[in-house]
UniProtKB/Swiss-Prot annotation:
Protein name: Phosphoribosyl-AMP cyclohydrolase
Cofactor(s) the protein requires to work: Mg(2+); Zn(2+)
Role description: Catalyzes the hydrolysis of the adenine ring of phosphoribosyl-AMP.
Subunit relationships: Homodimer.
Annotated Gene Ontology cellular component terms: cytoplasm
Gene that specifies this protein: hisI
One GO molecular-function entry: magnesium ion binding
Cited SUPFAM superfamilies: HisI-like (SSF141734)
Enzyme Commission number, as recorded: 3.5.4.19
A biological-process GO annotation: L-histidine biosynthetic process
Top EC class of this enzyme: hydrolase
Organism: Rhodopseudomonas palustris (strain TIE-1)
Compartments where found: Cytoplasm
Key word GTP-binding present: no
């Protein structure tokens, strides 16, 4: 389905969204939908990002993950700088189509721009005073971000 037909403003019955066979993503007010990327092999959550309609189309057409960067205000292909591309093996939408789940083969072993396997490398615990503290659970870096991104 083309982005033009997906973005058409014709009313859609809830049953068509929840039980139908047509992709009708519910983009937010900024034209974005939340995407959760997981490692297809391990099931680990790798990252949470956003797609606009064009990123979603490119992902479907190419089989590689494309996202929309809210900070840079542009499309980006995962791995365009690092080479750590996400090959999409399966895509799903949730019941009301306002979130996308992609199962990927993460090349290079790292999804996070910090060089780690996952962006979820810290656990929230409570310190001695009861205040929340972050505990690193994955210190291993697959690459040095300063070398890859030139920071």
């Amino acid at each position: 389905m083309s982005s033009e037909s997906r973005s058409a403003s014709s009313p859609v019955a809830p049953d068509d969204i929840e039980e139908g066979v047509v992709l009708r993503p519910k983009f937010d007010a900024h034209g974005l939908v939340t995407v959760v990327a997981t490692d297809a092999r391990t099931g680990d959550v790798l990252m949470v990002a956003f797609m606009n309609d064009e990123a979603l189309d490119r992902t479907i057409q190419t089989g590689e993950a494309w996202y929309y960067s809210r900070s840079r205000k542009r499309l980006w292909k995962k791995g365009e700088t690092s080479g750590h591309i996400q090959k999409v093996l399966e895509m799903r939408v949730d019941c009301d189509q306002d979130a996308v789940w992609i199962k990927v083969d993460q090349t290079g072993g790292a999804a996070c721009h910090t060089g780690r396997h996952s962006c979820f490398y810290r656990r929230i615990d409570r310190g001695g005073d009861g205040a929340p503290v972050l505990i690193e659970t994955d210190a291993e870096r697959k690459f040095d971000p300063d070398k890859v991104y030139g920071k």
